Amino acid sequence: MLTLLIPVDGSDYSRRAVDYAIRRAAATQGPTRVHLLNVQAPIVTVNVKLFVSQESLETYYREEGTKALADTLALAQKAGLETHPHIGVGDAARVVLDYAAEKAVDEIVMGSHGRGALAGALVGSVAQKVVHGASIPVVLVK
């Protein structure tokens, strides 16, 4: 079974990565498992815990992650892929690399840029860090 990890952030690049994975799965002889991973940046301020409970933060991350995953999850499910959505919190590249190792995925498929990308950048910073840190193939989708 081919196992893919697709980091998604709700951007058009994420959708294109899922489109690529659907085509890749169709060309593969056998089933494909797709892990869709959204990574929320941690809210880090000096006194955040004085004003917001840990439960409220976790609810916020879950709600934002669910929104970011919605379109790509529906697209992958409609294509008949076995999907496993997940929401992580932390440094995006580190969370992606750790998740890929934990789930023993075969390949990471991700957009070359995300929501926070600079318009003139050739490759987004998260994508660049993942490419350099991964020990498995990484496909960047434009």
Show the residue positions of the predicted features.
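Small/aliphatic-rich secondary-structure junction motif
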Residues: 2-52
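General small-molecule cofactor/ligand-binding pocket signal
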Residues: 35-37, 84-88, 139
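A short acidic, glycine-rich active-site loop
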Residues: 54-67
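Glycine-rich, Arg-bearing micro-motifs that act as flexible, cationic patches
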Residues: 107-132
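Amphipathic, non-transmembrane alpha-helical secondary structure
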Residues: 15-23, 70, 93-97, 101
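Structural beta-alpha unit
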Residues: 74-108
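Short, flexible loop segments at boundaries between secondary-structure elements
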Residues: 133-142
